[in-house]
């Protein structure tokens, strides 16, 4: 049996440290080896034991988290998960941390409903496990899930020949998780101003997808924004599912639209790639082009197989360029992938598929 993932928690709030320690310690696949109130205390802790993952706050006294992150990545690289506030300032700092090498982001736990606390526990534990795997760039021992995995059946029926829509309009659907923020930037920066409409699910906490969309919008030639319920899918535009909401592709006459709605965690996620992919299989069928990028777990694999079976062109990111080769690996294993490509080749391949060549 593989040893538990060792985690060091660094946060200036004693309450947050204790809450995170309690949530993580409840998972048999995780061991909290220490907590620290600031980076200086953390450095002392690391002299005694080197963790597999550091859970790091950004705003701290004496030394902020970004400075500590830079030091970690230049002196002793380790997987780092950012534990951030949900403020606008916190979101911007989080994306700066991702540029410096952090591999995951979670929101600070807070008191709430039973459902909120249960879902927070799942997301935090999954983020830590994903970060631990990111260092290895390969799939390792898979621990038993602590909560049931619902499938896309929880949100909509599977595709059938009856539901396939006869149309020639192409639409692109993309799913990503760990490492996806940088992968999506590479993918979207390669898109021309008249690119086909794109719908994206990136596993990310609530309140961060808006800032992420604005960041991409400022550097890409296409328009990128957080999706709202009823949005029309348009050429030259990418819609990113809001954190904590599912996004489904729909068809309204001659146009594709998106439905943004609440619902249970599907494949332990909301938004779920499987939900987006299944809806695309139902309403776009062979007119969809799908890409599954870096990420831990299996969200999107079943949905990609459904897209493939309906005649869609499907692409998976290769292991060499993935931060975590989990979601693409599972999609390949299920037989739902037409092509396996390095990250920088995916956008050109998507455009060729949309052009019918």
From Swiss-Prot:
* Main EC class the enzyme belongs to: hydrolase
Record key words, sorted: Chemotaxis, Cytoplasm, Hydrolase, Phosphoprotein
Question: Where are the 4-aspartylphosphate modifications?
Answer: 57
Its UniProt entry gives the catalysed reaction(s) as: [protein]-L-glutamate 5-O-methyl ester + H2O = L-glutamyl-[protein] + methanol + H(+); L-glutaminyl-[protein] + H2O = L-glutamyl-[protein] + NH4(+)
Q: Which residues form the Response regulatory domain?
A: 6-123
Name the Pfam families for this protein.
CheB_methylest, Response_reg
| EC number(s) given by UniProt | 3.1.1.61, 3.5.1.44
| Location of the protein in the cell | Cytoplasm
- GO CC terms on record? cytoplasm
Coarse class of the primary localization is cytoplasm
Check the record and name the SUPFAM superfamilies matching this protein: CheY-like, Methylesterase CheB, C-terminal domain
Q: Which residues form the CheB-type methylesterase domain?
A: 165-351
The entry assigns this protein to a family as follows: Belongs to the CheB family.
Protein name (Swiss-Prot/TrEMBL) = Protein-glutamate methylesterase/protein-glutamine glutaminase 1
Q: Origin organism of this chain?
A: Nitratidesulfovibrio vulgaris (strain ATCC 29579 / DSM 644 / CCUG 34227 / NCIMB 8303 / VKM B-1760 / Hildenborough) (Desulfovibrio vulgaris)
Task: Name the encoding gene, please.
Answer: cheB1
